[in-house]
């Protein structure tokens, strides 16, 4: 009965995350601004606006205004899972194949409103948006033998794997928004599209591998490994790399 020695398994993970972000690094971040901003200048003006540095060209912003005005979010969706099948052909000899899939889509948006106060003014509202989508799949198939005869033990493993990764991305910036209202903070509402950058990255990897482990009385150990990797990242004239290794040990 072949089904008696068959095993199947799977796992699946689906996630959705939204991260509110804040620029804390660099000379224009909220931490640097809090350290260098003149403490004698009030946070707000008499009419309820934000106080500036009081001096044009200082490239300095009110740290409270940075916190209140920052609208930077990162949204990510991910589907990750794998399925496998394992078959014990005869006692000690097992075949296994595993297929994994990982899909991700994420977006990062940062909206900068009009900043009128002196220090680091911004005369027009801007929206910077980055979108990525990636797909990765991998398949690994192995044949493994475990045997024992008296004080002798042997493990032999052979297999191959295939892996592929691709990512598409679009980066863009828009400006001249009619309103700072949150309902208008989308690229379709921009009066001007300043730039758009699109691209694609892709690579593939194919591998074959084998391993032999031998031990006598669990004291004398010997191992031989060999692996061959063919990658699209390697040069066209040298797509394959070969990696042999031999090791031995004696347990005292």
Task: Place the predicted regions along the sequence by residue.
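Surface-exposed loop/interface segments of Gram-negative outer-membrane beta-barrel transport/assembly proteins
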Residues: 2-80, 96-206, 233-235, 252
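Residue-level signature of outer-membrane beta-barrel architecture
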Residues: 4, 85-87, 145-147, 214-216, ...
């Amino acid at each position: 009965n072949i089904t008696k020695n068959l095993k199947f398994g799977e796992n699946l993970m689906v996630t959705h995350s939204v991260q509110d972000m804040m620029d804390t690094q660099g000379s224009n971040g909220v931490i640097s601004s809090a350290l260098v901003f003149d403490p004698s200048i009030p946070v707000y003006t008499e009419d309820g606006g934000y106080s500036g540095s009081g001096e044009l060209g200082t490239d300095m912003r009110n740290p409270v205004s940075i916190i209140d005005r920052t609208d930077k979010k990162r949204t990510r969706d991910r589907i990750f899972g794998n399925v496998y099948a394992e078959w014990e052909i005869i006692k000690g000899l097992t075949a296994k194949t595993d297929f994994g899939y990982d899909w991700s889509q994420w977006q990062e948006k940062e909206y900068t409103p009009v900043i009128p106060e002196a220090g680091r003014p911004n005369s027009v509202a801007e929206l910077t948006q980055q979108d990525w989508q990636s797909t990765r799949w991998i398949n690994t198939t192995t044949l493994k033998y475990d045997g024992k005869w008296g004080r002798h033990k042997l493990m032999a493993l052979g297999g191959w794997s295939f892996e592929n990764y691709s990512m598409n991305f679009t980066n863009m910036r828009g400006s001249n928004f009619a309103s700072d209202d949150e309902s208008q903070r989308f690229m379709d509402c921009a009066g001007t599209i300043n730039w758009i950058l699109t691209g694609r990255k892709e690579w593939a990897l194919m591998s074959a591998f084998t391993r032999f482990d031998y031990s006598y009385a669990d004291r004398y150990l010997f191992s031989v490994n060999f692996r061959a990797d063919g990658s699209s990242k390697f040069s066209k004239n040298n797509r394959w790399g070969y990696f042999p290794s031999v090791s031995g040990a004696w347990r005292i």
